[in-house]
Swiss-Prot record:
InterPro entries cross-referenced by the UniProt entry: ATP-dep_Prtase_HsIV_su, Ntn_hydrolases_N, Proteasome_sua/b, Proteasome_suB-type
Gene Ontology MF terms in the entry: metal ion binding; threonine-type endopeptidase activity
Gene (UniProt): hslV
Family matches, as CDD domains: protease_HslV
Annotated TM spans: none
The species this protein was found in: Enterococcus faecalis (strain ATCC 700802 / V583)
Protein name in the entry: ATP-dependent protease subunit HslV
């Protein structure tokens, strides 16, 4: 039996030298074995191009959360932290939202946050966040490059290279990578 859920991806966000970059792959997988699309755009700019959001998980759920997050950004005049906290609280307390299976990374030119359905809003200690099926691979690769690699490598290249490494390892991640930088 094939599940009707569409999911799996890898998103990686990196801050270095005051620059923020987020990379995501384009693979949409149905169930555990069927690649339905290889060119999905799961990293995008919102709020007058001032905020970048990346999502992993069930595609329909992720779109719902992205839309709700953008609504919160508008409601709180672009205050990223406030919008993220309000979304997380709503996600946790509204019964209709509790079943949503997705995670978000959101960032502007000042900060990045991970927003989860369990109510967490997490700021990274080291300027790196990664989510999705290949998230741990991308996180490890990005940390290695940022901490031990070429000191001149910018955030954009670290995020992209981390996604490429994750795509080499994770069957739910492909090499069709989109990168957004602030």
């Amino acid at each position: 039996m094939v599940e009707s859920q569409f999911h799996s991806t890898t998103i990686c966000a990196v801050e270095k030298d005051g620059k923020f970059a987020m990379a995501g792959d384009g693979q949409v997988t149905m169930g555990e074995s069927v690649v339905m699309k290889g060119t999905a755009k799961k990293v995008r700019r919102i709020y007058n191009d001032e905020v970048v959001v990346g999502f992993a998980g069930s595609v329909a759920d992720a779109f719902t959360l992205e839309e709700k997050f953008e609504g919160k950004l508008n409601e709180y005049n672009g205050n990223l932290t406030r919008a993220a906290v309000e979304l997380a609280q709503e996600w946790r307390t509204q019964q209709s939202m509790q079943k949503l299976e997705a995670m978000l990374i959101v960032m502007n030119k000042e900060e990045m946050l991970l927003v989860s359905g369990t109510g967490e809003v997490i700021t990274p200690d080291d300027g790196i966040l990664a989510i999705g099926s290949g998230g741990n691979f991308a996180l490890s690769a990005a940390r290695a490059m940022k901490n031990f690699g070429d000191k001149e490598m910018p955030a954009k290249e670290i995020a992209k290279n981390a996604l490429n490494i994750a795509a080499d390892i994770c069957v739910f991640t492909n090499h069709n990578i989109i990168v957004e930088e602030l």
